[in-house]
């Protein structure tokens, strides 16, 4: 009997193959006391495990094939950075000595503490980094107990092998190039987890976040991985198999056609130019940006320069990163978002003004621009680095989590101070356009006042939807209430877009809605002309744009915006995408 499981679509595509179960699970953690005179030996054992883990990761990074996606090396580098952080390399030793316990148990106590801290982070992407931390912990643990860190792919794998695992690390995926891996599914992972990102980057059909797939699948069982809709079908019947074989052929044909429009300008059927930008978090992502023909960078997440370290990154260190990216863009625009962190994410080097106060809801506490304003030295240091990078090409600076015009005014004062400091030092710096992230309802409602002070706004739909609907999409019990097509969300977006257009100020969306083709035509009809997304979604969105007529879509959008019922709005959006005009977009 067939079983259908629903998860998160990661790598797009459809695959039919034989399941190969990766049985590596959660390791049993021993717990025992250590005699005081043996504590030094236990510390040495832990240090040796750290060294062995570092050697493994460095060897893996050196073994990455040249044609592998840049994200693979970036994630292994992230694991190395996490390994060297004191929270994993030194603090377990403090626990070991204080409680006189074995290294494995001390490591577990510390990882449980860190996992709870990650769970309290509001930002989806940063919260998902918990899995990276846990994978590093697993490597350390395995080296402590003498277990292998490699997944078992022994035996003769079939040409259509589908890996079934609890989770896959970046290091695991290095093996994909050497093995017959058609697709993979995991029980763990969310939309912004490294597993999802690597699935997209490796261009392998994949579905993650299935929870119990491994318990329901037997070795070599036939499975269908639908990486388009996030569906796994176990033991399908012949009718379903034939239908998915047809869908797989259609998808491959569709993909070949999409590759033909990489260098085509994103212009609608009625001649409206649309700007398609990429969201990135490292210099390594520039390759993907160029590969998919992005017009520039709509969001550079700068906070990764600040994570997992004991001191704030220096101005010169930040300048080198920003300037390097600006130069690689060769004249294309980049929007750098100033650091979007909370005290719950990395409190070790924050000043007294931002000491954690035990807030039960860090998302509503000292986060985003509030933290920047509480740490003016950090804020001005970053802005000086961005200003200096702007001497090498067009740069926009964007402030996160703005709630009011008073915050914007304070930011402008700090910007003026940063510019004056550079002038006094005789440093060369360039002009920057200034903008704000609109991701808080208060900012959305007062966007007109905010736009009087800045050049552009970018809508962070991920957080805006969560705040508007009071729902945490990372919580499985309420995630179904996260509805981008909810009338309250659509009316809020329309207000922001219409206000910015009327004031002739720039407006974009940089949340997931920008890369979701379900909403492309609706957003065009609402007047959006700048989309910023994961580079992997650019061609699919461009294809819809090329076949869209904005004049027709404006009428359709107006009808949808008059809806008051979420279900009716969703139905009308589906009708919009299934209309004759939408059908003409099919490649």
Name these PLM-found stretches.
Residues 1-328, 334-341, 375, 382-383, ...:
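Non-catalytic, soluble scaffold/interaction modules
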Residues 255-587:
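Conserved alpha/beta-domain cores
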